[in-house]
Amino acid sequence: MSSQPNPTSHPEAASAASAASNDPVVKIDSLDMEARGVGRLENEDGTPGKVIFVEGALPGETVAYRSYRRKPSYEQAHLVEVKQASVMRVKPGCQHFGVCGGCSMQHLDSRAQLAIKQRVLEDNLWHLSKVKPDVVFRPIAGPDWGYRYRARLTVRHVVKKGGVLVGFHERKSSYVADMTHCEILPPHVSAMLVPLRELVGGLSIHDRMPQIELAVGAEVTALVLRVLEPLNDADKDLLRAFADQHQVQFWLQPKGPDTVYPFYPAEQELAYTLPEFGIRMPFKPTDFTQVNHQINRVLIGRALRLLDAKPTDRLLDLFCGIGNFTLPLATQGASVMGIEGSEVLTTRALANAEYNGLAAKTSFACRNLFEVTAEDIAALGRFDRWLVDPPREGALAVCKALAELSQAGSDVLPKRIVYVSCSPATLARDAGLLVHEAGYRLAGAGVVNMFPHTSHVESIAVFERD
């Protein structure tokens, strides 16, 4: 373990360290949602003073800091020096950590990352909604590195850097990090970052390609090039040669997401697999799919166990996407209805059910679930169990509808809801409605480490109603 912070934890850290003796010191008590260390000063009369948010500091550490933003009740600061290091501090696994904004917690032991994320989840549930789970689930965790199968890479032609940069933004900046590799991307993709820079630099439109979307499937790695001007014949030849050499598939996006099309090789199928269920899921690189394939498989397994559906049950999958949960549920013998707000994803879910021979057990509908009413829910009829997997905005309208139906004495409410969340704040808000107004109890909740080394907190919760 390292007793000093990574010198790249902030661009100013190395130069500032020489003046550390002149900088104020604070004891760090916790981390906030952005993985910043949180400490509190003490006023001269002994009363609690300002809160200090220190980038790169960890709980239990005493650090010297330098403020860059001052407000009456708090300050935001850069880490200058670790005076007393936490036993949780480790050496970051990537040389670009601290400059690149892709990760914020590589300096923290992976087990401690999980513990902190679990605490963030429980704190949100209690402080925002006064809800506690009956049981805290064991965290769902997987590989710490090479897990990111989806990513959006920014492309920027920077004359001062001598050419094109391809990578994530610098931390809290619009600049692109000068990256030669990335430890959270699959190794074969990480190895392509420098060749991609060279490829784009050789194109006639090297300054008219703002981003590259990455989607890795079971056999195919797709790269979607956002092109603001057409490629010429020489450009196309360069792309074909690169695709053959690096075994990738190029897609082009001349305008909005609906204009994406496969360029070369056009005949390859992008798909991910769920081998435990004998399922193959074709998708387009612009479709929403989970970033972390390994965690997704474990998450599906836990969701199915928590639902504990019988073959005679009717199941409802809200925000179903391309059928990530719907189709595995259907393999268990139950009848499943998936509802999704995107027409494109609904169409893909229908096609995937047909592709996997599950059309007879599934049905799909396209509805705006952010504006759903109690009448809309009642019109669906009764489903025994629900799975809800909303985006960061959560499922507020759905939970409000359930609360209204509960208060009206409706019999359409499910006995069990499994809720997969990518925002502890919106999960807490929705849990408050379900528990305090819809008659449910929070039977269990736990974190899902979909994004190791970041402050993103994904989770799974189960609600039960007697």
From Swiss-Prot:
One of its GO terms (molecular function) is iron ion binding. Residues 1-22 are annotated as: Disordered. Its EC number is 2.1.1.190. Residues 17-81 form the TRAM domain. [4Fe-4S] cluster binds at C94, C100, C103, C182. Pfam families: TRAM (PF01938), tRNA_U5-meth_tr (PF05958). Keywords: 4Fe-4S, Iron, Iron-sulfur, Metal-binding, Methyltransferase, rRNA processing, S-adenosyl-L-methionine, Transferase. It catalyses: uridine(1939) in 23S rRNA + S-adenosyl-L-methionine = 5-methyluridine(1939) in 23S rRNA + S-adenosyl-L-homocysteine + H(+). S-adenosyl-L-methionine binds at Q290, F319, N324, E340, N368, D389. The active site is at C422 (nucleophile). One of its GO terms (biological process) is rRNA base methylation. Gene3D superfamilies: 2.40.50.1070, Nucleic acid-binding proteins, Vaccinia Virus protein VP39. The keyword S-adenosyl-L-methionine applies. Catalyzes the formation of 5-methyl-uridine at position 1939 (m5U1939) in 23S rRNA. Belongs to the class I-like SAM-binding methyltransferase superfamily. RNA M5U methyltransferase family. RlmD subfamily. This is 23S rRNA (uracil(1939)-C(5))-methyltransferase RlmD.
